[in-house]
Regions:
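Conserved beta-strand residues within beta-sheet cores
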Residues: 23-25, 39-41, 68
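Acidic surface patches and DE-rich sequence motifs
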Residues: 30, 57, 73
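Charged, amphipathic alpha-helical segments
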Residues: 1-14, 36-41
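Structured surface patches comprising rigid loops and adjacent beta-strands/short helices at the edges
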Residues: 43-45, 65-80
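Acidic, low-complexity, intrinsically disordered interaction modules
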Residues: 36-38, 44-51
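SH3/SH3-like beta-barrel fold
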Residues: 26, 53-58
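A short, Trp-centered hydrophobic/proline-enriched beta-strand micro-motif
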Residues: 19-30
Length: 81
């Protein structure tokens, strides 16, 4: 695994990826503790005050919300708070 990065940097990069419609590799936990892999998903919007980002699967158009503080890996980097 690569060098760890701060969550604020991750959020900035997700906003940029959403602006340019670039795919990301993201791993996060769900509220119940299960892991979810969002490899190849495109960030749509983020709400810094609400603490969520919406991601879209470009293959089928499915949209999901991810809680920012539950992200533990971004593009191969581990994430710390």
């Amino acid at each position: 695994m690569m060098e760890a990065i701060h969550i604020n940097y991750v959020l900035e990069q997700m906003d940029l990826a959403g602006k340019y419609r670039q795919r990301v590799r993201l791993k996060a936990w769900k509220k119940d503790g299960n892991e979810v892999d969002y490899t190849g998903w495109v960030p749509l919007t983020g709400h810094w005050r609400g603490g969520i980002h919406r991601l879209m699967n470009p293959v089928n158009g499915e949209v999901r919300a991810v809680i920012d503080v539950l992200i533990y890996e971004f593009n191969g980097h581990s994430v710390y708070l």
